[in-house]
Amino acid sequence: IADWILGTHLVFEPQNHIRFEEDVRKELQISPIDLHIHSNFSDDGYYDVEDLFAQAQKAGIRTISITDHNCARANTIARRMSALYDIRYIPGIEIDCMYQERRVRVLGYYIDEKNELFNSVESESLKREKRASLERARKLKEHTGMVVDMEKLLENNRFQMVTGQEIARVIFSNEVYRQFPIVQKYLKDEDEEKAISRFAEDLFGQGGPCHVEMRYPALEDILEIVHLAEGIAVLSSWNCDHFGEAFISSLIARGFDGIEVFSPLVSGETMARVVKIAKGEKLF
């Protein structure tokens, strides 16, 4: 994908019958790039847009893309920062969706971030997260009798997301609830941080009594949005360690233009499988 984006390729001088003092094979320099960055417009991002450009400049990265979760807002700021820091910028986004009852993510590159469709993507994401947060609290009350003030937790919550871990922390900070048997059984055997994590996993994790199943837009709808916004759709490597080759091939057939291969979050074995698919399908 780097060669395609930058238009670079390796060049070797032909081995003619000409005598040189030394081997003069040359190759064009390929600039470092990072096309999967999250800013603080994502719930898992820490840095604002300018901080990311400053860090990229310091690291010698020449091309970046900020692909926030279900949000295209960073791109407008990033375009201004691009000129200021002399770093090439490719507008991007990463959108959650569903395919065959499994959650996948679509990376959109070269998008027109001003397209109104992305406002809808973000709005629906915030509504979805708020509904899920309230449902977690409702199930907790039903299962344990413990009540969490969700209005307070959501009041200044930028992403309208209150996780099971955050709810567990509120419960463990309440002196009355700490005396409940369901909380005591976690406190008596472990230190507090481990107790909170295990409580959250047991109650809100997959199969737990307070677990909330999330539903996302259909993959086909998200691919259409990216293409209508003049972008290219790339399958994110997120969770690909758990996707079989047949499933990935089926995904690609729905209309992807490319696939993310290299990521520190996936195994070498997965990268090898994905490279094979990308070459076979002639993907970016």
Positions of PLM-derived features:
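Secondary-structure boundary/capping signal
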Residues: D86-Y89, V148, Q179
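An N-terminally biased module of ancient metal coordination in phosphate/nucleic-acid-related enzymes
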Residues: I1-R102, L203-K282
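Conserved phosphoryl-transfer catalytic core
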Residues: K127-G164
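Alpha-helix capping at helix-to-loop junctions
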Residues: K114, E142-M146, Y177
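Alpha-helical scaffold segments that flank or form the walls of functional sites
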Residues: E50-I64, R80, E116-E122, L126-K141
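Active-site phosphate-binding/coordination module
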Residues: I77, E94-K130
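An N-terminal domain-start capping segment
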Residues: I1-T8, A137-K152, E192-A200
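Conserved acidic, metal-coordinating active-site core of Asp-based
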Residues: M161-G231
